[in-house]
From Swiss-Prot:
Lineage summary: Eukaryota, Fungi, Dikarya, Ascomycota, Taphrinomycotina
GO BP, sorted A to Z: negative regulation of transcription by RNA polymerase II
Stored InterPro entries: Gfo/Idh/MocA-like_OxRdtase_C (IPR004104), Gfo/Idh/MocA-like_OxRdtase_N (IPR000683), Gfo/Idh/MocA_oxidoreduct (IPR051317), NAD(P)-bd_dom_sf (IPR036291)
Similarity comment: Belongs to the Gfo/Idh/MocA family.
A Pfam family per the record: GFO_IDH_MocA_C
Organism: Schizosaccharomyces pombe (strain 972 / ATCC 24843) (Fission yeast)
GO cellular component: cytosol; nucleus
Keyword Oxidoreductase applies: yes
Disulfide bond recorded as keyword: no
Gene3D superfamilies assigned: Dihydrodipicolinate Reductase, domain 2, NAD(P)-binding Rossmann-like Domain
Protein name: Uncharacterized oxidoreductase C115.03
A single MF term (Gene Ontology): nucleotide binding
């Protein structure tokens, strides 16, 4: 199969940091064929400066009318995702869409139904499934060394008291805010591990007051999974703030036979911003000092006479967002319905985000 002719919609940070580098890293699978750059001129184009042979369109309808384009990557603000994804699917294109997918569950459901009716792939860019720290946490949970997990805490905390002037991300428009931003990643990771929760309890706030924000920049969301059969209840705690000076706990997982704690962020984003490429040696490799710690007791330990836990350092799994695009290629090629980011998971994330807002507004838990 020749490389899939791909068009990227947008020329912002998302396109140049999270999409172009990974398409470029897989030349036998994807051809960077076209780009939507509305402000491009004959002499000035960000896309053409980076990729001299790329076709640059300033009009979406003209791009979608190009019969050579097989895959469209939607790397635009979330308030336009629904409209553009729908147009792309109706034009017969496979679609990769940046997160957050859509502002509402109903929009997302309609688009998945449209994609299915046309036998097209609709892939949401939940690249943080391939964060090394998350892959490490997942591996430890699946190994059973923690026993039954009863609490899974996931943070994404930064120290950013200021904000960029004029940033669309801080405007009160559909799909904006911390929950739809990093929250959609943390929720997706939780759903991929534990499935859809029974209920959601959340608190959302605007913590930075320089100047006051019109959208939330803090959340604490608890996903409740009740006891089922011989399984203990699980509480999943997801939290993010921009007011966290020097404390970067990423995961804290507690089970009946052990605990795991990890600090620091996955290195891929900072590596990409610094110009490192996905195929470069060391890409996605964590620093030794940020390796997580695992405390365990034997699985068959007597609960009435538990020994002192044994502590070991756990090397971080090497992540690579390139694996997302590998999976996109395989699904388009084989149509095997094996793409790892399933439609029911994406729809669960949409429901949880909507429930988080309702919970915070009503100061109550929302049953899904």
């Amino acid at each position: 199969m020749p490389p899939i002719k791909t068009a990227v919609l947008g020329t912002g940070v998302s396109a140049f940091v999270f999409h172009f580098p990974f398409l470029e890293a897989l030349p036998s699978k994807f051809e960077i064929y076209a780009c939507l750059e509305r402000r491009a001129t004959v002499t000035q184009s960000k896309a053409r400066s980076a990729y001299p042979n790329i076709l640059v369109y300033t009009n979406l309808d003209e791009l979608l009318a190009d019969v050579n384009i097989e895959l469209v990557v939607v790397s635009l603000p979330p308030n336009v995702h629904s409209e553009i994804v729908k147009k792309a699917l109706n034009a017969g294109k496979h679609v990769v869409c940046e997160k957050p997918f859509t502002p509402t569950y109903e929009e997302a459901k309609e688009l998945y139904e449209l994609a299915e009716s046309k036998s097209l792939l609709l892939a949401i860019y939940q690249n943080r499934r391939w964060d090394g720290d998350f892959l490490t946490a997942k591996k430890i949970i699946e190994s059973g060394r923690l026993g039954q997990v009863v609490e899974f805490e996931s943070h994404f905390d930064r120290y950013r008291l200021g904000r960029k002037s004029g940033s669309w991300k801080d405007e009160p428009r559909p799909g904006n805010g911390m929950v739809y931003g990093i929250g959609s990643h943390l929720i997706d990771q939780a759903v991929s591990l534990f499935g859809t929760p029974y209920s959601v309890t959340a608190k959302l706030e605007a913590q930075r007051q320089i100047p006051p924000l019109e959208v939330e920049d803090y959340f604490r969301i608890i996903l409740h999974y009740p006891a089922k059969g011989n399984k203990l209840p699980i509480n999943v705690i997801l939290s993010s703030t921009n007011v966290s000076c020097g404390c970067e706990m990423r995961f804290c997982i507690k089970g009946t036979r052990g605990s795991f704690m990890k600090f620091g962020f996955d290195p891929q984003e900072s590596q990409l911003h610094s110009g490192m490429k996905p195929n470069d040696h060391g890409f996605g490799t964590d620093r030794f000092e940020l390796y997580g710690n695992l405390w365990t007791v034997p699985l068959d330990a007597d609960v009435k006479a538990l020994p002192e836990p044994t502590k070991i350092t756990v090397p971080t799994v090497q992540g690579n967002y390139r694996d997302f695009y590998d999976a996109v290629f395989e699904e388009i090629l084989k149509k095997a319905n094996e793409f790892p980011i399933k439609s029911d998971q994406v729809l669960a994330v949409e429901k949880i985000m909507e429930a988080a807002y309702k919970s915070s507004e009503s100061s109550s838990s929302i049953q899904l």
